[in-house]
């Protein structure tokens, strides 16, 4: 599945990461007598959780310089899509690499310049804003969720509470 836009990214991430969280939720409610509304809320919450966690992984992977680096793999993650969308010569190195105009070997010699581009571009902040929107939606769904204490609170603690403190 080729990701060319933020909308494509969000759909793909919900399908990929959201499905993992939906499966985990299913394992939790499968033996319970849940209403269709509760199951739908859990699935919506799972989709939000998938996005929250994937955006965090994408941000971290863009900044690492080992084999897991998303930039070197030309992955079209949320921060990468942001960088690809900026029409400014300052971001040409990044865009040329994704377009195949320059090699990975050349990119590796330009590590400091690329890190500067990443840090000054706003792509990290943009990703954090999108993640914050997902967190707000997750909180809204969570607040409406009918679940027994302390399990409801434990679920939040395990799945996304640590992200609520991110600036």
Task: Describe the function of each predicted region.
Residues 1-167:
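All-alpha prenyltransferase/terpene-synthase fold signal
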